[in-house]
Amino acid sequence: MNQGKIITVSGPLVVASGMQEANIQDICRVGHLGLVGEIIEMRRDQASIQVYEETSGIGPGEPVVTTGCPLSVELGPGLISEMFDGIQRPLDRFQKATDSDFLIRGVAIPSLDRKAKWAFIPKLSVGQEVVAGDILGTVQETAVIEHRIMVPYKVSGTLVAIHAGDFTVTDTVYEIKQEDGSIYQGSLMQTWPVRQSRPVAQKLIPVEPLVTGQRVIDTFFPVTKGGAAAVPGPFGAGKTVVQHQIAKFANVDIVIYVGCGERGNEMTDVLNEFPELIDPNTGQSIMERTVLIANTSNMPVAAREASIYTGITIAEYFRDMGYSVAIMADSTSRWAEALREMSGRLQEMPGDEGYPAYLGSRIAEYYERAGRVRTLGSQEREGTITAIGAVSPPGGDISEPVTQNTLRIVKVFWGLDAPLAQRRHFPAINWLTSYSLYQDDVGSYIDRKQESNWSNKVTRAMAILQREASLEEIVRLVGLDSLSEQDRLTMAVARQIREDYLQQNAFDSVDTFTSFPKQEAMLTNILTFNEEASKALSLGAYFNEIMEGTAQVRDRIARSKFIPEENLEQIKGLTQKVTKEIHHVLAKGGI
């Protein structure tokens, strides 16, 4: 422990002298109030400290005490359904302890509840050899999540004691005799530095799709479990709703939602909606699998920078248990702005638009902690982290540094489009500018698992949309009626794909989520209409006759998005109805 004194205060940056024994990334207690800060730069005996609380009223001469430890999070039972701030302070217990709706400065509250007792069930017995990552036992944390207590990193040896029963997170639950003869006494909780990624046995290639229930994503721009995706878009394009939809319905075990520098009412929406929503995979409340990290725009800027790392470290902990985890960061642009502010106050050489020169490497550090891995431990298991980051470029300009650095790393780009949002087409993901580099892997995985021709259907549907885009300029110049019959059909089918398939109402109880079998049935109906109508045109039928003769079945295809999942056979039955009605048109015309 080293004590210095403040010489300069500049917003969230405090410079202290007499800190020659301190290290970079040490946590400090700043001023008489004991504010939490982290050393981010050392020059001789002077330390530059990033303070995670409001610094007003702090002045030169006040003491600074280092703890000698890096910024770390507590990992153990009690994380699920909890809401933390950027440095893992529990907001509900903070409010009860301080009796204030605002963050009182200098208050230290442990992240995990020290009074709560958890029922621990051992899975190993005394005398067994254990290594780091082995599962010692379990705690049923919620109705959905079984919390697996693991041997901490760098601990191995013989299990000499393990107890069943109800324990707090600090009680000694097991003892391990290590190779040097020392006894390690372990509890239900472990700590981990947030800026250091948790070690794994092996990184694997992600192949299994993350099913989100959003048709435009699952069909055209899928992300895998263990993948990384970015959602850039201008104000009002629907970034937050896309993030909320994925958090609600993605087929993962755990969701970490990081509200980083965005509006507080968005976190309020999460708190109001999530407890009432039922997870379609488990039948339980979605909050039973969710961890919330709230660092809204009215909270200290410096803590935004920590919130992303706090979230990804908690995600890695659950991944090491063998769970699939999705982490949503809304928005990484606000996090980058916090980096820019601290860099400016440190008087570092600025890069593009004032962002620090190391912006790209910091963004890469975050997204590279996602992935599919084989975890440590003698019991073989796999875990995944899927990282989905919203980016808020000013004015929707994706050429700005945060978006460009993000796109260099992630493999999925869901580009939200202001003109689509203005036309009330939601989700406003532009199918011509977005891309997914997982498309081939996911397509072959689904073809193999479902024994279907899914990837071929997706290719055909995208070809229709691209053909529509190439015809649009001709239509604007000379009108729709001047096109050939075949091109008029292409325009009509493309409109069906856009309005009846890609458009989705997040606030409709049925349309908000579409399972994969339902997506396939809906797309098959539209493509069958295109195929049969195209054949009819080649046999001599007229476009207008086909459209009039199939008006009823096309209306039913359009309404199929509102048919509940349990009535899937109704949607599948429309395929034969389409063929029958087009044959009827041909017969009526004597063809």
Swiss-Prot record:
GO-annotated cellular components: proton-transporting ATP synthase complex
Catalysis performed (reactions): ATP + H2O + 4 H(+)(in) = ADP + phosphate + 5 H(+)(out)
Recorded GO MF terms: ATP binding; proton-transporting ATP synthase activity, rotational mechanism; proton-transporting ATPase activity, rotational mechanism
GO BP, sorted A to Z: proton motive force-driven plasma membrane ATP synthesis
Nucleotide-binding in keyword set: yes
InterPro entries for the chain: ATP-synt_VA_C, ATP-synth_a_Xtn, ATP_synth_asu-like_sf, ATPase_a/bsu_AS, ATPase_F1/V1/A1_a/bsu_N, ATPase_F1/V1/A1_a/bsu_N_sf, ATPase_F1/V1/A1_a/bsu_nucl-bd, ATPase_F1/V1_b/a_C
Residues the entry annotates as binding ATP: 233-240
Keyword tags: ATP synthesis, ATP-binding, Hydrogen ion transport, Ion transport, Nucleotide-binding, Translocase, Transport
Transmembrane segments: none
Superkingdom: Bacteria
Entry keyword Acyltransferase: no
EC number: 7.1.2.2
SUPFAM superfamilies assigned to the protein according to its UniProt record, in alphabetical order: C-terminal domain of alpha and beta subunits of F1 ATP synthase, N-terminal domain of alpha and beta subunits of F1 ATP synthase, P-loop containing nucleoside triphosphate hydrolases
Family of the protein in this entry: Belongs to the ATPase alpha/beta chains family.
Purpose: Produces ATP from ADP in the presence of a proton gradient across the membrane. The V-type alpha chain is a catalytic subunit.
Identification of the protein by name: V-type ATP synthase alpha chain
